[in-house]
A protein has these predicted regions:
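Membrane-embedded beta-strand positions of outer-membrane beta-barrel proteins
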Residues: 29-33, 81-83, 136, 147-149, ...
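Outer-membrane beta-barrel translocator domains and adjoining extracellular loop/strand segments
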Residues: 39-53, 91-102, 152-172, 204-215
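Detector for outer-membrane/organellar transmembrane beta-barrel domains
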Residues: 78-90, 97-154
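Predominantly the C-terminal beta-signal and adjacent terminal strand-loop region
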Residues: 53, 86-91, 102-106, 111, ...
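Short glycine/proline- and aromatic-enriched beta-strand/turn motifs that initiate or cap beta-hairpins
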Residues: 21-89, 104, 143, 153, ...
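Outer-membrane beta-barrel strand-turn architecture
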Residues: 71-77, 128, 139-144, 184-188, ...
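Cleavable N-terminal export/targeting peptides
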Residues: 1-28, 238
Length: 238
């Protein structure tokens, strides 16, 4: 629903911009090859383990394709609004952890997992897809350079197999992006772009599907995520 509302709002903005005068409008459409580097600081709290927490830092690098459409107007200093979409961003690396939480076993100093016996393999897996961006662009004079800022959303599909039988729900990731780039001409109607952006994602949080028998709490995972993206694009203008 959030994505639908965002798309409707963007389309409405496009229509409002279009009434400024057909002769001043320029429409663009194209495809992009993107490279992204992301950093995450995650914390997982296990149920029925005296609040046992696991902290982990991770760095991710991935590449993906996207498509975009834009409209801009000379009557508002060349200000443009656009929408880009990438159906698949990254398949997260699958990780298997051996868990042996025997009754009364001391997990960390002074932390005993009394009453817990979740022994087995914990499989961590997932993917990020449906990356949607709604953004504004503003040219820097006639230099070909431009500034960019916008809103982003993606879906983190979780596919974890926890020893406790609990599962995490999928997470809607939202955030903002800022950056800039350079646009060059390829003939009369084609163009190319080189662009760099920084994405600031809102903090992520998800709870497990099953409550613990001892405390009634649930597994919980929290994460802070940031990313940078470089893009090369080609497109047509009308």
């Amino acid at each position: 629903m959030k994505k639908i509302n965002t798309i409707l709002a963007a389309v409405g903005a496009l229509l409002m911009l279009s009434v400024t005068g057909a002769n001043s409008l320029e429409f663009k459409a194209g495809v992009s090859a993107n490279g992204m580097a992301a950093y995450a600081n995650a914390k997982e709290t296990l149920k029925d383990a005296n609040g046992r927490t696991t902290n982990e830092e991770a760095i991710l690098a991935t590449s993906f394709a996207s498509a975009f459409v834009e409209v801009s107007s000379d009557e508002v200093m060349g200000l443009g609004i656009g929408i880009s979409y990438a159906p698949e961003v990254v398949d997260l690396e699958k990780e298997t952890r051996g868990i042996q939480n025997h009754l009364g076993e001391t997990l960390t100093a002074g932390n005993t997992a009394s009453g817990v016996n979740d022994t087995g393999n914990q499989i961590i897996d997932g993917k990020i897809q449906d990356l949607l961006s709604v953004y504004l662009t503003l040219p820097v004079g006639d230099t070909g350079a431009y500034l960019k800022a916008g809103w982003i959303q993606a879906t983190l599909i979780t596919a974890e197999n926890l020893t406790t039988g609990s599962k995490y729900e999928d997470i809607d990731m939202t955030g903002t992006q800022v950056g800039g780039g350079y646009e060059g001409v390829l003939g009369d109607m084609a163009f190319w772009r080189a662009e760099g952006t920084y994405q600031r994602w809102e903090d992520l949080s998800a709870s497990g599907s099953e409550a613990g028998a001892t405390t009634g709490g649930k597994n919980k995972i929290e994460a802070e995520v940031g990313s940078v993206t470089g893009s090369l694009s080609i497109g047509m203008k009308f």
